[in-house]
Amino acid sequence: MIKRCEYDTFWPILSSADSTPKTAAILADSNENRNNTMNISVFCGASLPHSEQITEAARQLGRAIARGGHTLLYGGSNLGLMGATSGAALQEGGRVVGVIPTFFSDDIIHSQPVSELVRVRTLAERKEYLIAHSDAFVALPGGIGTLDEVLEVMVANQLGLVRDRSGANQSQGKPMILLNLGGYYNPFLEQLRLVKEEGLMRSDAGLISAYSVEDIFLKLNPIVKD
């Protein structure tokens, strides 16, 4: 099995630090920099995983985004990990923007009113909206829909198609963070390593691996301060 440190070595942007500060410390740091608040898109599914650890991490992420003064953007459903993440953010008084295609029925939309609900026609339009209106992206452990969203961001970063919220070109791309709980994304990272080794991928495309909710903000805070 490939260990965590090997991925941290391969992806230059990844941190190899083993120690993670406590959530309170990171949130305090976030609160001191409210002028640097972000729109953070969370990619996750409308299903609940078998692992309660993943579901609890989704709730922690929603709370952390709200407490940091950031805005949560997500796929608009009240089901599964989408509901866990957005519900936790709403309970903390956070701003939550749901982006949902019109072909989904109304009964999957959040029962607690979100701050803003954006209706789009297709899944492609949802991804386009999230990429255009977000400063950073976090993927919880997820299925093929989540992987599709991750790869969409990576392709946009690699091709230089990403723009900031003002519409200006953002040549350095936007951070795409994988929450790699328990090594969930290790096989995916290994495949990307092979792709890059074969010369079929030019860069890390903004990909960052984090190992806890605390680690996400440890890695995002220096980026937003810049």
Please identify what each model-predicted range represents.
Residues 8, 18, 29, 33-36:
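Intrinsic-disorder-associated, low-complexity terminal segments enriched in Asp/Asn/His/Tyr and depleted
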Residues 125-162:
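Active-site/ligand-binding-proximal alpha/beta "capping" segment
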